[in-house]
Amino acid sequence: VSDTANPIPTQPVLSLLAEGRHDEALKAATAALVEARNEGAEGDERNTRICQALHTLGDVQREMEQIVGAEASYREGLELAGDRPDLLGERARLRMQLATLLDFNQREADAAPVYEQAAADFEALTPPDDVTAAQLRNNLAMIYKGLGKFALAEQHYLRSLETIELRMGRESEAVASVYNNIGSLYYTAGFADEALKMFKEGLIIREKILGPDHTDVAQSLSNIATARHEVGDNMSALLDFERALRILEENVKEKASSYEAVGGDYISLLEALHQERRAEAFQKRMQKVLSTLA
């Protein structure tokens, strides 16, 4: 199903936003909405133009952190779009914007059903926009994980993984990220063995496409180390932590917080294994490295 009708011009508004001229962008978007409401067209054509103008206004309000206004604009746009087949694409985009707005403002439970609807809309387009739907399902899975609904989270992660792997190929960062997310889900749910398998899959992909010394590789190694400790393979866990820390130390200017967090986990493991001298030695090293950033 394709969109129809002549759209409200959005490029001037987007250009103003890109230039940081937010007040002018808001004024232009508001004027476009007033024009759409007052024009002579009637029925579906008028509603289409108002819907598009509301979408643009909502985007501007969101950029300006006018959260209440943005939500109201998106919801009014969705109400006008209704269930019209010719506005399926517009409806999908409005729902996506509304879902992410709610999600990023700590209203995850409100965002979840909107994500569900948006993903279904993108999948129903002709041709389907499966990749966007998969990205939305990944976000939705993160919400369900946070809400403790692990089975639902797994369902959406696996659907996301299947689509992204099919459309983008196995050797892509997007696929590696979903494997990492699934591993995190399994770990949180208490399935460390399964988590370890997922983390390893993500590591294999990241090493191949990013190289062995990339900071995302360090993230995978840290996750693997944590899972190894949980299953009792502490010696391997130490080695993975140490490799991750070498990578992060080389990139400490950009990854100081990650270096400190992983270093703390490494120290905790050393202390749990009664290797206090090694723990103390690394603590001093980490403090010295971090002090160079002050």
What do the PLM-derived regions correspond to, one by one?
Residues 2-3, 40-47, 88, 127-130, ...:
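Inter-repeat boundary and helix-capping residues of tandem alpha-helical solenoids
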Residues 33-41, 78-83, 119-124, 161-166, ...:
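Amphipathic alpha-helical segments of tetratricopeptide repeats
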Residues 10-18, 48-63, 89-104, 131-146, ...:
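Conserved alpha-helical positions within TPR/SEL1-like repeat arrays
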Residues 235-246, 264-292:
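TPR/TPR-like (Sel1-like) alpha-helical repeat modules
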Residues 1-88, 95, 293-294:
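Flexible inter-repeat linkers and adjacent short helices
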